[in-house]
Design a protein with these regions (language model features):
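PLP-dependent amino-acid enzyme catalytic core
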Residues: 1-486
Length: 486
């Protein structure tokens, strides 16, 4: 299996190269040359580690199969508490795919617990001995998940950049207290898009790359722009379908719809990849918060990033430039030149418009909707009062949209992407309680009000010392990168 850039089909690489490099030299994203067709029924009989092994090996064809078997088995065992890809019944034929039972309590763990192993093996496959410098822009969950996955990995340094004031306090503390000799965390003035643009500029700066190469350092990414982030996320769509099949809720071949709280478009794109591999996915419902740039695009075909930015209670979705949409545009248009043109227009004017036939092709699989802040709070409250199901703010966005888009007789799986205890003040307020200013007091009150226990890793943050408190401008991200030595 080869991979090539969304902006230049002539730039072909192996999966090891795609994972080690992260981003193509000209700024494009790596995509697979084809979608492998799998025996879905056979996969549905596997446990989660074996399922992950079977899916990722279809794409990572230059990796040793024995390595992939061991890597997936060791990743998706104890760290997920026996709940990897756990599907919870909620109401009727609506379900929650709980993706927050990993070490950092967010869905990013599924990729970022495996990806460090894939990177180390990729370097071995390529005969590379240089230091890898990973730069990560985060709207909250990716940062901690990447730090947890990569801390103290030999031959790797990682620097994480998050928007100051743009995460929950729990998310900030998860990053600021991270242990490890090879980790660094910076708050960036501005929003997530400012941080992400700053990181992308570093990746696109040939002078920086050349200087770092002299020091025997190569840049890489742990964001969902890296193919190594996407491939593990395909797996849990198969896992959800398998559980519905095993429970007798569907017959093999029946369609299942998925509603995904969406920011950078990586999680929902993994569902598209699962569908292309043969999984009977019906509709992929893209759920946005008040930063509803994707809702507008999927409705009109015009992407407009120059718009008012809202800080919401679902900060991981507070994004106006959704990077992985570029991959979908490539798959639908089949044209690297067209995609490159869209990205040039976006950089120059903040907007682009796809052809009507392109939009129609996208709408065959994708539908969309968005939730206001009031609707998110109401969804958390009503969902808990009606079904006893406690969800976080991002999941509430998806539940609200899923109710609007539910098709009669077709199961709807809502991707639950984070523990409600990562956002205790927002969830407590939504339940009609007066939320204290302190997140840990809010966490305790949320436990008392609901009878749910906070994950131990989150409760333990209260006693951990903060290691990182530096605030920088977006332009200083390049200075941070240039400060590293081999």
């Amino acid at each position: 299996m080869q991979f090539f850039s969304t902006r230049d089909q002539n730039r072909k690489v192996t999966s090891s190269q795609a994972i080690a490099q992260g981003l193509s030299d000209e700024g494009g994203l790596f995509v697979p040359e084809s979608f492998p067709q799998v025996d879905v029924k056979a996969l549905c009989g596997l446990d989660y580690p074996a399922l992950a092994d079977a899916v990722v090996r279809e794409y990572l064809t230059d990796y040793d199969p024995a390595f992939l078997t061991e890597a997936t088995r060791s990743t998706y065992g104890a760290a997920f508490g026996g709940k990897a890809g756990y599907l919870a019944p909620v109401e009727g034929d609506t379900y929650a795919l709980e993706l927050w039972h990993g070490p950092t309590c967010a869905f990013k763990d599924y990729a970022l617990q495996l990806m460090p192993k894939l990177l180390v093996e990729a370097k071995k496959n390529l005969g590379r001995t240089e230091k890898t410098l990973i730069l990560v822009a985060t709207s909250g969950d990716t940062g901690k998940a990447a730090l947890d996955g990569y801390h103290d990995i030999p031959g790797v340094e990682i620097a994480v950049f998050y928007p100051t004031g743009g995460t929950s306090e729990i998310q900030r503390l998860q990053m600021a207290t991270q242990e490890g000799a090879n980790v660094a965390v910076y708050a960036v003035r501005g929003n997530f898009d400012d941080a992400q643009t700053g990181v992308k500029k570093v990746f696109g700066d040939k002078a920086i790359a050349a200087e770092l190469e002299k020091r025997n350092i190569r840049l890489s990414s742990a964001n969902s722009i890296n193919w190594g982030r996407l491939v593990p996320q395909i797996v849990y769509y198969f896992a959800a379908y398998a559980q519905l099949l095993k429970a007798g809720k569907i017959t093999f071949g029946d369609e299942v719809d998925f509603c995904v709280p969406t920011g950078n478009f990586g999680d929902i794109l993994a569902g598209y990849y699962a569908k292309q591999m043969g999984l009977p996915v019906g509709k992929l419902v893209c759920a946005s918060n008040e930063n509803n740039v994707l809702t507008d695009f999927l409705t009109t075909g015009t992407y407009t990033a120059k718009r008012e930015f809202f800080k919401t209670t679902s900060p991981s979705m507070d994004i106006l430039v959704s990077s992985n949409l570029e991959r979908l545009l490539y798959h639908v248009t089949g044209s690297d030149a067209e995609v490159a043109g869209f990205m040039q227009q976006l950089a120059a004017t903040g907007s682009y418009t796809v052809r009507p036939e392109t939009l129609a092709a996208i709408q065959e699989t994708f539908s969309c909707g968005w939730s206001s802040e009031d609707e998110v709070a109401e969804e958390i409250r009503s969902r808990y009062e009606k079904d006893g199901y406690l969800c976080d703010t991002h999941t509430a966005v998806a539940f609200h949209v899923a109710a609007q888009k539910k098709r009669q007789g077709v199961p709807m799986v809502v991707l639950s992407t984070a523990s409600p205890f990562k956002f205790p003040r927002s969830v407590l307020s939504a339940l009609g309680k007066a939320a204290p200013e302190n997140d840990f007091e809010a966490m305790q009150q949320l436990e008392a009000a609901t009878g749910h226990a906070a994950p131990a890793s989150l409760a333990a943050l209260r006693s951990k010392p903060e290691r990182f408190d530096t605030v920088i401008a977006p332009a200083q991200i390049a200075e941070v990168a240039m400060g590293y030595q081999a």
